[in-house]
């Protein structure tokens, strides 16, 4: 008698989740977690095929958020997310728009960019 193999993994279904968007001046990172903070999927603009100065564009950030949303919907059946944005980059708003256009319901958007209260000394100014 042949053994029957199961195809695919038994994955848990997560209806709600948190999308962490780290938008720097040179890159954008998207990390999707469950409500406990366990990472379900993570990607960046460089992993989606962009390189050089094209990584810092809002279009690239939208594309990476779009691919992350499609993967999470397909794998885990996620429908509702809350978004946490960190960093001063240009791609944060484009990434949130891409999440909405992909079919995810965005319940809240929080900007948790770290702002120093005159803590550490800044880097030296660039001279051009």
Curated annotation (Swiss-Prot):
GO terms for molecular function: rRNA binding; structural constituent of ribosome. It holds the Pfam family Ribosomal_S11. InterPro entries: Ribosomal_uS11 (IPR001971), Ribosomal_uS11_bac-type (IPR019981), Ribosomal_uS11_sf (IPR036967). One of its GO terms (cellular component) is ribonucleoprotein complex. One of its GO terms (biological process) is translation. Disulfide bonds: none annotated. Signal peptide: none annotated. Keywords: Ribonucleoprotein, Ribosomal protein, RNA-binding, rRNA-binding. Belongs to the universal ribosomal protein uS11 family. Part of the 30S ribosomal subunit. Interacts with proteins S7 and S18. Binds to IF-3. Located on the platform of the 30S subunit, it bridges several disparate RNA helices of the 16S rRNA. Forms part of the Shine-Dalgarno cleft in the 70S ribosome. PANTHER family: 40S RIBOSOMAL PROTEIN S14/30S RIBOSOMAL PROTEIN S11. This is Small ribosomal subunit protein uS11. It comes from Wolbachia pipientis subsp. Culex pipiens (strain wPip). The gene is rpsK.
